[in-house]
Amino acid sequence: MKSLILVAAGGAIGASLRYLLGAGVYRLTGGPTGFPVAIMMANVLGSIAMGFFVVWAAHRGLTHLSPFVMTGVLGGFTTFSAFSLETVTLFERGEIWQAGLYVALSVGLSVFGLMAGLWVARGVYL
C-alpha cells in the first residue's frame, strides 16, 4: 500500500511537471507549433533522468525510491522513459533482436491501438 501511495504522489508530481513544461513551451513559442515539442522534450528529459536515476540509485543504495521516482514521477512526466530503459536493458544484455522487436511492436501496436480507439469511438459517437 505504501508503494502505491508513493507511485500516486510521484505520478501527480510528474504529470504536473509535464503540464508546466507544455505551458512553458506554449508561452515561449506563442502557441501551437504543429510539432509536439513539449512532449518530445518531456520524453527526452524523462529518459535522461531515468538513465541517471538507475545508476545513481544503485550506487547510493537508494533503489527503494524507484517506485516514487521511476514509476511515479518519471512515469507521470513521460511513459517514454520506461520504454527507453527497457529497450536499452535488452541491448545491454545483447538481446538485439528482442530490443528491435520490442521497439517495433511497441511503437507500431501503440499507434495502431490509438487508431483502433479512434475508429471505435468515431463509430459510436459520430
From Swiss-Prot:
Record GO cellular component, one term:
plasma membrane
Tell me the Pfam families matching this sequence: CRCB
Segments passing through the bilayer: 5-25, 37-57, 65-85, 101-121
Q: Which reaction does it catalyse?
A: fluoride(in) = fluoride(out)
Task: Name the major location.
Answer: membrane
Disulphide bond pairs: none
Can you tell me which family this protein belongs to? Answer: Belongs to the fluoride channel Fluc/FEX (TC 1.A.43) family.
Spell out the activity regulation.
Answer: Na(+) is not transported, but it plays an essential structural role and its presence is essential for fluoride channel function.
Origin species: Roseobacter denitrificans (strain ATCC 33942 / OCh 114) (Erythrobacter sp. (strain OCh 114))
Keyword Secreted assigned: no
Instruction: Give binding positions for Na(+).
Output: 75, 78
Report the superkingdom from the record: Bacteria
BP term (GO), one: cellular detoxification of fluoride
GO molecular function, one example?
Answer: fluoride channel activity
State which gene encodes it: fluC
Q: What is the lineage of its organism?
A: Bacteria, Pseudomonadati, Pseudomonadota, Alphaproteobacteria, Rhodobacterales
The protein's job, in short, is: Fluoride-specific ion channel. Important for reducing fluoride concentration in the cell, thus reducing its toxicity.
**InterPro entries given in the database record:** FluC (IPR003691)
Which compartments is it annotated to reside in? Cell inner membrane
User: Can you name this protein?
Assistant: Fluoride-specific ion channel FluC
Q: Determine if Transmembrane is one of this entry's keywords.
A: yes
Which keywords has UniProt assigned to this entry? Cell inner membrane, Cell membrane, Ion channel, Ion transport, Membrane, Metal-binding, Sodium, Transmembrane, Transmembrane helix, Transport
